[in-house]
Amino acid sequence: MKKALVVLVVVILAAGAVFWWLSAPQTLAAGDLPDHSPDVENGRLVFDAAGCASCHAEEGAADDARLLLAGGRSLQTPLGAIAVPNISPDTTHGIGGWSTVDFVNALTEGVSPEGSYYVPAFPWTSYRGMRLEDAIDLKAYLDTLPPSDRADEAGGLPFPLSFRRPIGLWKRFLLPELPAAPAGADA
């Protein structure tokens, strides 16, 4: 009986280690980014095409008001509420303190600068095929917008959905591959 318990504990620990390894965030390093001078005007076009203001600006904001990306909305889902964060260039409450590679990893890999996964309510799954140059340009444009010192709202998904490590397994095994771009295509 004691031997069976030891074997069970070893199997559980081994399975946990495999889960932890398979679900680890895979991110880009700064050296993986292309040598690219940011184009703020292209970043503005990417901002408009990606619809960043539709979630991160105040509801109904128009013109210049839609450029204050203070977050604060609550996305109601069948699984719980998700607070929309401040993505203004504020260095305390927004993303102003993020490096370019932090931003690109959040946008295309769904991984925060701290190494945790974002839930796909943030549509990183749609942006993961974006050209890295476009992501760099978007960061440069966001850095030109007005900062907001609005703190992110508390809340989120209930346990166990708040445990995001399984997203790594979903990414590794279930997230569909991106279609290959035709040769010579400008994505």
What label would you give each PLM region?
Residues E41, L45, E59-T100, Y118-L132, ...:
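Gly/Gly-Pro-rich "capping" loops immediately C-terminal to redox-active cysteine motifs
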Residues G16-A24, S99-G115, S126-D152:
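C-terminal capping alpha-helices of c-type cytochrome domains
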Residues P25-D48, R165-A187:
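Electrostatic cytochrome c docking/interface patches
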Residues C55-A61, T108-E109, P123, D143-T144, ...:
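Detector for the c-type heme attachment site
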Residues M1-L28:
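N-terminal type II signal-anchor transmembrane helix
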Residues G43, A49-E59, F103, L138, ...:
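The canonical Cys-X-X-Cys-His
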Residues V18-H36, A57-P78:
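Conserved N-terminal glycine/acidic-rich loop preference
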Residues V40, P123, A140, D149-L161, ...:
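Interaction-mediating elements
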